[in-house]
Amino acid sequence: MKIAYQGEAGAYSEMAVYKFFGSKTVEPTHCKDFKDVFESVKTGTVPNGVVPIENSIEGSVNQNYDLFLTYDLKVCGEIAVKLAHVLITNPQTNFEDIKTIYSHPQALGQCRNYIEKHKWEINPTYDTAGSVKIIKEKQLPNTAAIASEKAANLYNMKIIARDIADNPTNYTRFLVLSHEDAAPTGDDKTSLIFSAKHAPGSLYKALGEFASRNINLTRIESRPTKTTAWQYNFYIDFEGHRTEKRCTDAIQAIEKYATFTKIIGSYPRVI
């Protein structure tokens, strides 16, 4: 079964694919960017895709929040992957030779203190494993990549330093894309987008509909609507399945305080 992800072989997103679906029957299919993952699922090229949505250090992956608004897809699962960044070079490069670091912006941010300590320049790229591929194919001197040990092994590159992240407790949460969300399990989570009316107390009252039904919100994120200045869409995760009566009632109740609502999906709770 083909599953789309963003990045090259050895990327953390590929690890998330294997962790969620297992390694025996899955065929990870790499995409250049996140939009391509959504598009591949939308068109039926693949049945599912896996995208990162938040990191425990650097926070939200905003582009994917925006893509959930654009695409009419569902979330059918979530998975957390522990990131263990290593510093990777061509075999002939020594540590003292390094001047520039290639990696995805999120990984660069997660290793910010280590990079600044050594006064290295940074070169943001589209992917962690892709950075390893770039410095190998171009045989870049004085250059290292931040990626996984798996990426170093896949491209036969040298690991020159380990434990380089600012915080060893470094996890990324991934969501699994589909055309349908998951059936209730009794321990679920639902993701929802809504835009509160521009009136006093609208957001407060909308969120109160969950509290009054004893529904726990596990995350709330705001993003600009990009259509009206200073107007925001709110992305919320809450415990429960959308088919549960208390959840259905809460979703219906917030509509009187919102200009629109969109259920992204209900899925088994992992985090």
Residue spans of the language-model regions?
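Domain-level signature for soluble enzymes in the chorismate/prephenate branch of the shikimate pathway
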Residues: 1-271
